Amino acid sequence: MPILEVKNICKSFGSTEVLKGISFSLEQGQVVSIIGSSGSGKTTLLRCINMLEKATKGQVLVNDEVIFDAADPATQKDREMRKKRLHFGFVFQSFNLFPQYTALKNVMLAPELAAKERPDYKQNRKEIHAQLEREARGYLEQVGLGDKVDNYPYQLSGGQQQRVAIARALMMRPQIMLFDEPTSALDPEKVNEVLQVIESLAHEGITMVIVTHEMNFAFKVSDRIVFMEKGRVVCDDTPQAMRSGHHPRVEAFLKDVSLA
C-alpha cells in the first residue's frame, strides 16, 4: 500500500490552469524527485499535497486515507487540514527561521506549542520541556549543527539555516518530508552541505518528495524521477530508465541542464 497517493490533482488560479491532472504514488521509504523547467507547476504541486493550496480537483491520500478531496468539503475544514498537514514536514526555499530565537528554540517551538494542548501539560511541563529539548538537540546533531544550538539565525550561514529548517521539520516526526528547491536560495559553496543532509535522510529510509534543479543529486538519491512540463507529468520512471534515452523530451531537458 502506498504511503502517499496523488490522484488527478488539478489547480487553477483564476483562468490559469497550473496543474492538469497530476497523479503519482510513493511507497514507504522511497525518494521521488520532481524535476522540470521553471513554471511547470512543481512547487504548486507540493503545496497542494500538504494543503497549503487547495486543489481545484483531485484527491490526496496518506496510508489509504483520503486527507483531501476537492469534491468533499468535509476534508477542507481548516481545523481538519491543520491536523492532516502534520503527516508532512515541509522545507521551503527560504529558511523562515524566527530571528529572535536560537537554533534550538526554532526547532522546539512547534512541538512545544502542540504539547500545550496535552491534558497533562501543566502537571508535567518540566519533563515535557526536557524531553523536547533532548529531541531537538538530537535532530540538530543529526544535521551537523550540534555545536550551533545557541546560535541565532544571523550567526549562521545560509546552509546552516536551511539545516536548522530541516531539523525543525524532522522534529514533528512527519511520515513524509517535502522539499521545495531547498538549495535555490544558497550560495553555491553552501549547496553541498544541505544536499549531504538530505542524502543521509534517504539512506535512513525517510520517505521524501524533492523538487529540485540539482539534477545530479536527484539522479543519485532518488528511487524515481517525475518530470513535469506545463502542469502535466510527462514521465515517471527510475533514474536509470530516464538516462536510457527512451524519453526524448526528458533526454532533451537533461542535455540542456548538463546532467553528468
Question: Where do the protein language model's features map onto the residues?
Answer:
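Conserved ABC ATPase signature
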Residues: Y152-L156, Q160
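H-loop/switch region of ABC-family ATPase nucleotide-binding domains
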Residues: T212-H213
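A short, surface-exposed alpha-helical micro-motif characterized by mixed small hydrophobic
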Residues: A218-K220
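Helix N-cap at the start of a conserved alpha-helix in ABC-type nucleotide-binding domains
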Residues: P188-K190
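A short, proline-enriched helix->beta-strand linker immediately N-terminal to the Walker B motif
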Residues: M171-Q175
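Catalytic Walker B motif of ABC-type/P-loop ATPase nucleotide-binding domains
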Residues: M177-D180
